[in-house]
């Protein structure tokens, strides 16, 4: 489930606190009520968004750094880092100097393009993704 713009702003502003609390929640079927109590205590009305963020960050392994702000849809749609690296190398070898990813979501391919020396700009129609 995605985030509203308000939730995205909250998550960005509270990323450090979320990172500190994340190890306290397992986010399993058997821990759901205990996890929700922890998240409610720390984040109140934003507990659902924080839960989605933590679960999504954990699922992002192999696609982009786990500390990035993301949601479950962005993780599912993200290009795996190895695939992004090959794509970036091919585009650089073709002589491009600049890449504009018009549907970048959370920008999972940006590090690969940066690593091969290409300038990269990402945009997306989803305003909440722009905020995260």
Residue ranges of predicted features:
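Conserved SAM-binding loop of SAM-dependent methyltransferases across substrates and taxa
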Residues: 106-118
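Conserved SAM-binding motif I beta-strand of class I
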Residues: 119-124
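Conserved SAM/SAH-binding beta-strand->alpha-helix loop
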Residues: 126-128
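Conserved class I S-adenosyl-L-methionine
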Residues: 96-103
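S-adenosyl-L-methionine
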Residues: 1-94
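Conserved small/polar residues in nucleotide/adenosyl-binding loops
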Residues: 130-132
């Amino acid at each position: 489930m995605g985030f509203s713009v308000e939730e995205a702003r909250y998550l960005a502003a509270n990323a450090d606190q979320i990172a500190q609390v994340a190890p306290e929640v397992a986010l399993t079927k058997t821990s759901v009520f205990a996890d929700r109590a922890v998240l409610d205590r720390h984040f109140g009305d934003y507990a659902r968004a924080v839960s989605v963020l933590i679960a999504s960050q954990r699922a992002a392994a192999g696609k982009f750094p786990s500390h990035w702000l993301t949601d479950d849809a962005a993780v599912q749609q993200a290009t795996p880092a190895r695939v992004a690296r090959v794509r970036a190398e091919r585009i650089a070898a073709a002589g491009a100097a600049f890449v504009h990813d018009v549907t970048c979501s959370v920008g999972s391919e940006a590090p690969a393009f940066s690593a091969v020396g290409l300038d990269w700009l990402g945009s997306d129609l989803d305003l909440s993704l722009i905020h995260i």
